[in-house]
Every structure is written in C-alpha cells, then in structure tokens.
Curated annotation (Swiss-Prot):
GO cellular component: cytosolic large ribosomal subunit
HAMAP family named in the record: Ribosomal_uL2_A
Ranges of Basic residues composition bias in the record: 223-238
Protein name according to UniProt: Large ribosomal subunit protein uL2
Compositionally biased region (Polar residues): 206-216
Role, per record: One of the primary rRNA binding proteins. Required for association of the 30S and 50S subunits to form the 70S ribosome, for tRNA binding and peptide bond formation. It has been suggested to have peptidyltransferase activity; this is somewhat controversial. Makes several contacts with the 16S rRNA in the 70S ribosome.
Pfam family, one: Ribosomal_L2
Keywords, comma-separated and alphabetical: Ribonucleoprotein, Ribosomal protein, RNA-binding, rRNA-binding
Name of the gene: rpl2
Length: 238
C-alpha cells in the first residue's frame, strides 16, 4: 500500500504544517488612536520567521505596539505619532501630511487597518502625488496605488535591507530558516521518490514515465501532476 502524499499529510493540520505563530513577538500593526502622541522606542527585536526587525513602541498613554523598524531607528528614541507630526525619520504620520518624494513604510490602505504595504526588510514606498482625499504612492513592486489621506505611514525605509544577499552556504542554515516558517523543507521532487511514496516515483531514472495529466475527479492519493490540463507541452509556433 502506498504512502500518503505530502499534501495529504498537510491537509490533516498536523503540528509540522501549522503556522508557528506562537514564536512571533506579537501582532505587528498600528494601534487605533486619534490625536497627537509622543512615543518611545522601547526596544528593537528580532521577529522569528520574518526578515525585518520590529520596534517595540510605547505611547504616552501607556499603549504598547510593534511596527517594522525603519533604518536608523534606535532604542530609546522619541518619535511622534498621529496628526500634526512632522515627516521625520521614524515618525508615524497621516499620509496627507507628507511632502512628495519622501520614503515611507508600513503603509495603511485605510485608516485603522494596521499597515499593509512595504513591510518587509529593505522595502519602501514613495509619495508621488496627491489628489482629492487620496495620496498617491509608488509601491515596491512599481505599482501606483492610491491610499486614504488619513491612513498612517511610517517615515523611512524598513531596516534589514540586503538580508537576502547573504549566502546560506550550507543546508543546515536553510534548515533553521524554514523551521520557524509554515513551510515544509526540504521539498523533494516526486520523480526522486520511491514508487511507494509518489505516483511519479520509482525506476532507475528520474522520469514520470507515464502521462502526468490527471482528471479533476481523481482520488487524492493519485491527484498530482497536470490536473485537468487542457493541453501540455510546448505550443507550436505560428
């Protein structure tokens, strides 16, 4: 009897396939606030499984929250949050108060969503213009996006840029990289498995050796390859 496929084991919701969210420092988002506040950066922390460091910030009201740390932000630094805050490094300001050309990160689409864009290490968005009730940004992907003028943003570029340029050098480092993520590693190809482990496995060569197209109603243990494909292979040049 054959073994269960990787996707079948993942579908059971075993602890090995669940998102290890308990390792994170907490929810990285803006709090729901109004008015102007003075805040202090309590600490700069590593968030397991994420590329960017996070800053633990405490408001003058006692509320604590986490945001992606921007380049140049230091522990103990005082920042300003909310309406009327200047567009200085590390400050959290409404988008309408920003001049054109400034670099921002952890961008909200609507006020109160906590931040949705430019949150990973080294990323930023650029203010390119303003329209009625909207602020126009260029996102890291190059896409032009309009956000609500009252949406909060952090002035500066997210720290940790270039983290992907550091080579892993050995498989052991890659092991620890994926251990804190909801990703199974290493990812073994079906043709490299034994015949008992995968429909494409077995033989003395790494080839499917049969049609890899399967029907839509194929049973789960055999439903791998090109599922309900209209066509496969290269297209003929016209």
């Amino acid at each position: 009897m054959g073994k269960k496929l990787l996707q079948q084991r993942a579908g059971r919701g075993n602890i090995n396939f669940r998102n290890p969210g308990w390792l994170r420092v907490g929810k990285v988002r803006y709090p729901t606030i109004t008015g102007h506040h003075i805040a202090k950066v309590v600490d700069i922390l590593h968030n397991p499984g994420m590329t960017e460091p996070v800053a633990k910030v405490k408001l003058d009201t006692g509320i604590q929250f986490f945001i992606p740390a921007v380049q140049g932000l230091i522990s103990g630094q005082k920042i300003e949050v909310g309406e009327g805050s200047p567009a200085s490094l590390g400050n959290i300001v409404p988008a309408k108060d920003l001049p054109e050309g400034v670099y921002v990160s952890n961008v909200e689409l609507h006020r109160g969503d906590g931040g949705r864009y430019a949150r990973t290490a080294g990323s930023y968005a650029i203010v390119v213009g303003k329209s009625e009730g909207k602020v126009i940004l260029r996102l890291p992907s190059g896409k032009i996006k309009e956000i609500d003028e009252n949406a909060l943003v952090t002035v500066g570029t997210v720290a940790g840029g270039g983290v992907l340029e550091k080579p892993l050098l050995k498989a052991g480092n890659n092991y620890w990289k994926y251990k804190v993520k909801a990703t199974k590693w290493p990812d073994v190809r079906g043709v490299a498995m034994n015949v008992v482990s995968h429909p494409h496995g077995g033989g003395l060569h790494q080839s499917v050796s049969r049609s890899s197209t399967v029907a839509r109603n194929t049973p789960p243990g055999r439903k791998v390859g090109h599922i309900a494909a209209r066509r496969t292979g290269r297209r003929d040049r016209k």
